[in-house]
């Protein structure tokens, strides 16, 4: 792949597609009607802003954004500083404590430092109405995020996809396992984490796979931005 390829190059044309315009128009109309939609408009595409196509090493696929106040900011599983880690993220931390030597459970749930190291924190659906999980399913976001996965599949090699739960695993069916790595486990939600997410060791496995490709491993200890 030429290092100059960007998200704009490979999925920029999606913005011109009717399905994509319709999705954005629906979300804009809901906001105008006074509904609270998460994340804020400026944050919807943060995952792509923070992790450029040629920087992606790992993909962690989520479902739809958190639907509580001040949680979602465009990165799957991550919440804004000052907001307690939701239960699924709590289980991710629990797994990291046992999987990564020296990992300390943070007192926040802000995963931007992962994104800045090449972990694409991608939700399948990029918006949600406050308090209503899956309220923006089947609007068109799934088509867009399928194109994102297809672009990674085609234009990159050696990317590690962490697919947690049946939803993510279905979404990952198009990934060519001769070019990429797939790590599967149950979802980290409290309903399913004990069925094999806890103990999956995906984080250490990902770092081993990166090192085998002579790439820098991920520092999985989430860091808050330095206060200016």
Swiss-Prot record:
Q: What is its main location?
A: cytoplasm
Which keywords does this chain's UniProt record carry?
Answer: Cytoplasm, DNA damage, DNA repair, Hydrolase
Q: Where in the cell is it found?
A: Cytoplasm
Taxonomic superkingdom: Bacteria
Asked whether the keyword NADP is assigned, the reply is: no
* Catalytically driven reaction(s): Hydrolyzes single-stranded DNA or mismatched double-stranded DNA and polynucleotides, releasing free uracil
Single Gene Ontology BP term? base-excision repair, AP site formation via deaminated base removal
Gene Ontology, cellular component aspect: cytoplasm
This entry's Gene Ontology molecular function terms read: uracil DNA N-glycosylase activity
Alphabetized InterPro entries for the sequence? UDG_fam1, Ura-DNA_Glyclase_AS, Uracil-DNA_glycosylase-like, Uracil-DNA_glycosylase-like_sf
Q: What is its EC number?
A: 3.2.2.27
Keyword Ribonucleoprotein attached: no
Q: Which residues are annotated as active site?
A: 64 (proton acceptor)
EC class name = hydrolase
Q: NCBIfam families under this entry?
A: PRK05254.1-1 (NF003588), PRK05254.1-2 (NF003589), PRK05254.1-4 (NF003591), PRK05254.1-5 (NF003592), ung (TIGR00628)
According to its UniProt entry, the function of this protein is described as: Excises uracil residues from the DNA which can arise as a result of misincorporation of dUMP residues by DNA polymerase or due to deamination of cytosine.
Q: Which family does it belong to?
A: Belongs to the uracil-DNA glycosylase (UDG) superfamily. UNG family.
This protein is called Uracil-DNA glycosylase
* Organism of derivation: Yersinia pseudotuberculosis serotype O:3 (strain YPIII)
């Amino acid at each position: 792949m030429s290092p100059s390829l960007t998200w704009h190059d490979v999925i920029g044309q999606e913005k011109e597609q009717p399905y994509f315009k319709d999705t954005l128009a629906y979300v804009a109309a809901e906001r105008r009607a006074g509904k609270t939609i998460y994340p804020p408009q400026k944050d919807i595409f943060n995952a792509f802003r923070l992790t450029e196509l040629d920087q992606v090493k790992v993909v962690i696929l989520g479902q739809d954004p958190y639907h509580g106040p001040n949680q979602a900011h465009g990165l799957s599983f991550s919440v804004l500083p000052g907001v307690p880690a939701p239960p699924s993220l709590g289980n991710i931390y629990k797994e990291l404590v046992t999987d990564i030597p020296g990992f300390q459970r943070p007192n926040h749930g802000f995963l931007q430092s992962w994104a800045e190291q090449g972990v694409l924190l991608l939700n399948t659906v990029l918006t949600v109405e406050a308090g209503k999980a899956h309220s923006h399913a089947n609007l068109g976001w799934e088509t867009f995020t399928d194109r994102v996965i297809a672009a990674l599949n085609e234009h990159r090699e050696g990317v590690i996809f962490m697919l947690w739960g049946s939803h993510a695993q279905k979404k990952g069916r198009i990934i060519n396992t001769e070019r990429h790595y797939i790590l599967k486990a149950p979802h980290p939600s409290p309903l399913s984490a004990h069925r094999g997410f806890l103990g999956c060791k995906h984080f250490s496995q990902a770092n081993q796979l990166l090192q085998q490709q002579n790439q820098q491993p991920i520092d999985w200890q989430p860091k808050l931005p330095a206060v200016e």
